[in-house]
């Protein structure tokens, strides 16, 4: 095929998508995940200093859970990042409603309303994890070309840490995370970082990822064609809990030193998972090789999760470009 | 010339305690103490009783550092002598109870040795914390532990600073020893950190058993880091931090910090340098619990402490 014909072929294969209206950058959805808290504060300071023109597209900054941020806790009453399903968003608010349910509905009004035509195009929800996950982009759908292209872009541009894409594959109304309020929203998860700590290296990665996301949206809206191709993603399959005492439910083992910090490695049958306090190794019994992630996340002990397991998938995304009146 | 005349004869250490959960989200000590409360076989030694104990059970239950106030700052003379039990913050009540069970602080009936188990988000490795440069028993014990742990490094932090020293839970004992192992996030149990702490305690109890059995320990020296100064984060007029520990300093506990070295990085990318006249050795770099105590790190200086030979005093 000649170069001209190939170019024409690509142009014809492009998917035309509407321009994106802007992005909401949300930090402090969990009040002790500090990169996002400080990044949002820094962005608000920049806006005060230099005006809205500091970014080439409209940017809204949100401190999602201000009470939890003030107390440097994950949440006050309940995990806010589980409050955005259609069911919880439509729960009537009473005096005894958990703070986060109330606040989730406020955010839904501000950034949504989820499911309507009026929603924000993009939410970037900023999170940290105690797990060694580098930069992980989390999205609830496996077929959103805009989000997948942004992920692809971040993967090419960010080289300091591994950049991986995790898809949860929920129908949107069941998706319970903050970013599901928007059309193309995703979570920016950076680790490892302890709760209540801001590490400069982690902050810098998160800032770079937000800047590149804004950059992509601006380029896309300005007519850049983003070439299609393959995107490797990890799809959530199941969770695994710690070994526990049947009566007290106390832990009887810790994540094995050979698994600790090896997020997204390939885990095969027989590989060590846990080292018990009495010195025994608990090994993997899964039939098929899977990839563990969120290994030893501090907030997941109370959820009964030592790590999640994922399958690797290759998705193919088409070339995309912005819809203009000519190409509509 | 033998050093026979320079042997210090000390009282045997019959009553030993291991405290976990002084901070309810520092998991290694909590798991170890609970494990040994269930089954004390591992910590049994001839010639001594060793009591494992959870010092702040309500904080442990909520997996939080403290309920009302930091227990590890609560053992002040004012607190310990306070009355009106019901009106006191939870941790002050607890301090009084612990002082009654394991003290009284400064009294002849107090426990001989208390090991207080802590974790830190700082990259301090295995650290033993001492409150006195003249406690021969403790100096000989940490010397023994360091030798036994080698080639794994055990650093020794000495906090004898009149203003920066604080009233710790372990201070009710005659010989208080802090164990600080990191890095480990709050609320997380890392296997390697857990096992290091467990091994340190094994060697510590071995030492006490040998000592109580009449073994003489020859004179020794101990390399320590002596606490000098607390360094806070740069803050704005509202008290909010405006910079983070610089990537060049992050995780470099115990390494020299020289004049002109990067110290902080502002959120908008500017580097702030260390301007002190002398080389210092920072530690507790970026400990999560110290943001509210206005501490980004502490500076230390290196010192060599000498300890006489010791052996158990004959009755």
From Swiss-Prot, chain A:
Bound how, and how many: what does the cofactor note say? Binds 1 zinc ion per subunit.
Keywords of the record? Cell membrane, Cytoplasm, Hydrolase, Membrane, Metal-binding, Zinc
Q: Which Gene Ontology molecular function entries are recorded, alphabetically?
A: aminoacylase activity; hydrolase activity, acting on ester bonds; metal ion binding
For activity, the cofactor(s) needed are: Zn(2+)
CDD domains the UniProt entry points to: M14_ASPA (cd06909)
Which superkingdom does the taxonomy of this entry point to? Eukaryota
* Catalyzed reactions: an N-acyl-aromatic L-alpha-amino acid + H2O = an aromatic L-alpha-amino acid + a carboxylate; an N-acetyl-L-cysteine-S-conjugate + H2O = an S-substituted L-cysteine + acetate
Under InterPro entries, the record lists:
AspA/AstE_fam (IPR050178), Aspartoacylase (IPR016708), AstE_AspA_cat (IPR055438), Aste_AspA_hybrid_dom (IPR007036)
Which Gene Ontology terms of cellular component type are present?
apical plasma membrane; cytosol
Q: Where substrate is bound, by residue? A: 74, 81-82, 189, 300
> What residue range is the signal peptide?
none
Q: From the record, give the transmembrane residue ranges.
A: none
Q: What class of enzyme is it?
A: hydrolase
Xref: Gene3D superfamilies: 2.20.25.160, Zn peptidases
Q: Name the Enzyme Commission number(s) assigned to this protein.
A: 3.5.1.114
> Where in or outside the cell is it found?
Apical cell membrane; Cytoplasm
The way this protein sits in the membrane is described as: Peripheral membrane protein
Record-annotated residues binding Zn(2+)? 30, 33, 127
Q: Keyword Transferase, does the record have it? A: no
UniProt entry tagged with the keyword Calcium: no
Q: What family is reported? A: Belongs to the AspA/AstE family. Aspartoacylase subfamily.
**Assembly and oligomerization:** Homotetramer.
Function, as annotated, reads: Plays an important role in deacetylating mercapturic acids in kidney proximal tubules.
The cross-references to HAMAP family, in alphabetical order and at most eight, read: Aspartoacylase
What this protein is called in its record is N-acyl-aromatic-L-amino acid amidohydrolase (carboxylate-forming) A
Origin species: Danio rerio
Give the gene symbol: acy3.1
UniProtKB/Swiss-Prot annotation, chain B:
| Location in the cell | Cytoplasm; Nucleus
This protein's cofactor list reads: Zn(2+)
EC number(s) given by UniProt: 3.5.1.15
**Disulphides:** none
A single GO cellular-component term from the record reads: cytosol
Q: Which residues form the active site?
A: 180
Q: How is the cofactor bound?
A: Binds 1 zinc ion per subunit.
Q: What reaction does this catalyse?
A: an N-acyl-L-aspartate + H2O = a carboxylate + L-aspartate
Give the binding site residues for Zn(2+).
23, 26, 118
Q: Keyword GTP-binding: yes or no?
A: no
Q: A single Gene Ontology molecular function, please?
A: metal ion binding
Q: Which UniProt keywords apply?
A: Cytoplasm, Hydrolase, Metal-binding, Nucleus, Zinc
Cite the Pfam families for this sequence: AstE_AspA_cat (PF24827), AstE_AspA_hybrid (PF04952)
Q: What is its main location?
A: cytoplasm
> Which InterPro entries does UniProt cross-reference here?
AspA/AstE_fam, Aspartoacylase, AstE_AspA_cat, Aste_AspA_hybrid_dom
Residues the record lists as binding substrate = 65, 72-73, 166-170, 180, 290
* HAMAP family membership: Aspartoacylase
Which family is it part of? Belongs to the AspA/AstE family. Aspartoacylase subfamily.
What this protein is reported to do is described as: Catalyzes the deacetylation of N-acetylaspartic acid (NAA) to produce acetate and L-aspartate.
Q: What PANTHER family does this protein's entry cite?
A: ASPARTOACYLASE
This protein's name:
Aspartoacylase
Native organism: Danio rerio (Zebrafish)
Q: Which gene encodes it?
A: aspa
